[in-house]
């Protein structure tokens, strides 16, 4: 297995060694991109393998991020009310904030809250056989609801500014280079774990059923399987990945706001997977890193046109790269193999003719 997939291991080894060859700023940037790659793996599972196009995964990312940010904000406040609550005239910490004084609850909630929402949403939609563009529109409607709620309840969520100004995590300074390296390495470990688990899942019997659902859901139902169960599970799993990504994002970037969980970020998440190749887990990771790396480059050097670049990239992928970057790579490998086979056939044919003489 190691021999066959040596490129995967080399890729993750390069990620592990990044603290030795990247500056502190670039390492922080890469850590953020790897958080996005976690989301991309989940979207690849539901879109590439199961045929569920979700345009609302920003919500699950945001919920995971807010759960972690609530703990960080309370820790930074040092027993006092968070500053935005004081500015809004709140005199007492809301009851749903109190559990987040405990880090264990904050970490577990970053996974449980997105999963519960995903299970609730997916069960009722998939049970009623809502799919395709209708599910995509419904997922975007959920985004609008949550963004509006988070902006409107400023005294609870910080409004449009979100939650910021975190100083420590578990007593360690977030500005410390050592803390940032530890958080980065933890992100790599989590990403690798998600990749390996998803790879095992897609190659199992469960994964084959997911692909069958994507290709012909009615036939799967006719064979005695319940597609709703499979779709709810994989959709909830992708929400868990997004929630974990949100929690790690907050720890490394130091802020979260409703704008980061809105419609545009949710669509961008799908774009990452499309660029890398929606039916490839490693392609989803590469797509997230490449797209966000290019976005960072253009926003730094050409701030006036980076949105045009993003739109142009999406159009180019749809028109010319329907299978993404990994599709191009696989196509090149396939042609190379075919060329080798033809060359071998030609050489053997020549040898046969020579042997006759």
Feature roles, as predicted:
Residues 1-357:
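Transmembrane alpha-helices and adjacent helix-loop boundaries
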């Amino acid at each position: 297995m190691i021999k066959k997939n040596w490129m995967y291991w080399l890729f993750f080894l390069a990620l592990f060694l990044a603290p030795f060859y990247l500056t502190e700023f670039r390492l922080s940037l890469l850590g953020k991109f790897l958080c996005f790659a976690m989301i991309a793996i989940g979207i690849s599972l539901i879109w590439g393998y199961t045929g569920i196009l979700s345009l609302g995964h920003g919500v699950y990312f945001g919920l995971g991020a807010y759960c972690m940010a609530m703990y960080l904000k309370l820790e930074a406040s040092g027993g006092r009310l968070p500053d935005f609550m004081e500015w809004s005239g709140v005199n007492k910490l809301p009851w749903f904030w109190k559990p987040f004084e405990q880090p264990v609850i904050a970490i577990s909630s970053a996974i449980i809250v997105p999963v519960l929402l995903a299970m609730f949403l997916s069960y009722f939609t998939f049970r009623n056989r809502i799919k395709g563009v209708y599910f995509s529109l419904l997922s975007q409607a959920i985004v609008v609801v949550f963004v509006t709620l988070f902006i409107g309840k400023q005294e609870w969520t910080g409004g449009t500014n979100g939650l910021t100004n975190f100083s420590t995590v578990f007593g360690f300074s977030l500005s410390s280079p050592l803390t940032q390296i530890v958080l980065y390495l933890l992100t790599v470990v989590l990403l690798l774990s998600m990749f390996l688990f998803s790879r095992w899942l897609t190659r199992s019997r469960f994964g084959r059923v997911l692909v069958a659902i994507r290709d012909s859901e009615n036939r799967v139902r006719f064979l005695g399987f319940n597609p709703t169960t499979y779709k709810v599970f994989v959709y909830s799993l992708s929400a868990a990945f997004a929630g974990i990504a949100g929690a790690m994002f907050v720890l490394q970037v130091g802020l979260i706001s409703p704008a980061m969980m809105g419609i545009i970020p949710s669509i961008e998440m799908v774009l990452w997977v499309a660029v890398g190749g929606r039916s490839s887990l490693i392609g989803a990771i590469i797509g997230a890193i490449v797209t966000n790396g290019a976005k960072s480059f253009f926003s730094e050097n050409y701030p006036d046109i980076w949105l045009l670049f993003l739109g142009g990239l999406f159009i180019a992928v749809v028109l010319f790269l329907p299978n993404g970057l990994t599709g191009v790579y696989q196509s090149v490998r396939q042609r190379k193999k075919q060329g080798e086979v033809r060359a071998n056939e030609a050489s053997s044919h020549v040898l046969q003719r020579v042997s006759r003489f």
